[in-house]
Amino acid sequence: MDNLNLISNFAEFKELKNIDKSTMIGVLEDVFRHALQKQYETDENFDVIINPEKGDLEIWRNRTVVEDGAVENPNTQIAVSEVKAIDPTYEIGDEYADEIKLASFGRRAVLSLRQNLASRILDLEKASLYEKYSEKVGEIVTGEVYQVWKKEVLILDDEGNELILPKTEQIPNDYYRKGDTIKAIVKRVEMNNNQPRIILSRTANQFLERLFEQEVPEIFDGLITIKKIVRIPGERAKVAVESYDERIDPVGACVGMKGSRIYSIVKELRNENIDVVNYTANPSLMIQRA
């Protein structure tokens, strides 16, 4: 690839968030083929070769060798005398390939190509991020506090993606400073002005449920089920559990030896008072237990 600094280093594509290499190569080829169509009215007789490992890109034009004076389309045909001046072994009817340098496109076309490539990469990153976190809705994620505002906290995940924890989704006793590690559940993913907005929550009942799944193997394995959660975030919560194995005490398993399992959950929720009770389908009995 010539020194137009169109793509300074293909290795940088490996650092692009949320985009796999094969997708990136497809976008690159598509952008360059679009430029070829504008420049030559077709890209059918061109080969675009992208090698991200070596960090280069080549464009080759394939033309048919024809008799002198028989060239009707200089983009798809080349006179035999012209090609023999380069390589005497070529004959009429052969296919001749010559490399196309980006400089031949012209400065304006190269600038347009740069802009198109940057726009496509940005759109691809946004779409990939939206899809990635849409699949994570209901899951716990961990990130680092980057900025604390009055109405929300800006969090960065391990890839530098921006996540939002609104004030309304924070536990009343939550207090954060830049650099703090934060754990929350992905509540929803929105698309505002073509920009993904990933909303987290620490007040959702599902956050408490996922914390129990992390701390109690029997819940994670499906031996114990959380049937219902009633919660005032940061103050208290009632968690009704049921065991599918008569040998397992669901309440005891959730609390752990001397409260070892539930302690980390209480700590994560700013000392929220959590009561774990046995579930029953009898409403009046359930009220008594609660």
Q: Where are the predicted features?
A:
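RNA-contacting regions in translation and RNA-metabolism proteins
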Residues: M1-A290
